[in-house]
UniProtKB/Swiss-Prot annotation:
Pathway connected to this protein: Amino-acid biosynthesis; L-leucine biosynthesis; L-leucine from 3-methyl-2-oxobutanoate: step 2/4
Species for this entry: Burkholderia multivorans (strain ATCC 17616 / 249)
Protein name: 3-isopropylmalate dehydratase small subunit
Residues making up the signal peptide according to the UniProt record: none
One Gene Ontology term, aspect cellular component: 3-isopropylmalate dehydratase complex
Subunit structure: Heterodimer of LeuC and LeuD.
Amino acid sequence: MEKFTVHTGVVAPLDRENVDTDAIIPKQFLKSIKRTGFGPNAFDEWRYLDHGEPGQDNSKRPLNPDFVLNQPRYQGASILVTRKNFGCGSSREHAPWALQQYGFRAIIAPSFADIFFNNCFKNGLLPIVLTEQQVDHLINETVAFNGYQLTIDLEAQVVRTPDGRDYPFEITAFRKYCLLNGFDDIGLTLRHADKIRQFEAERLAKQPWLNNKLVG
């Protein structure tokens, strides 16, 4: 998992409340057994004018010119600012996969759905909770200024604006540690690989029958 320390990026505003996971990545794209390839279908039903299906050549599909992420000024955005209850609806880890593979490193909102919030951390996507007033300011500034950028300093736990404001945010020490070091669940486990191998060796020495193969 990629480390998150300090990130500066272009901001895109998604001025909608209650954006659910089916809007983030529609259900027909959940059939894949891979964890990659979801970025082109993030917000598929809002992003394109036609109905999307797995395996399509998305470069040939008609774009919805009214959807905010299709506007030229927000191309390459890596920070999404949106409204409350983002990521609600059904539980699907594909939602943070799609957002991350689109190019987002962080999502800022007044609140998130719990399961989506947890899934973000497991996949290196940083969800940041700010007040509604702070989100209002960021959305207004993003709309007013082309190429509006924010800096997110995870170590300091602040969002820095171009006009010199620092918006602090909360994150648990464990989640912060994992993001700063790029550790997902597998990475955390592998840090203890030597102890796991030692435990297995000691267990088999004490209980050798556990190593016997079953015969039919």
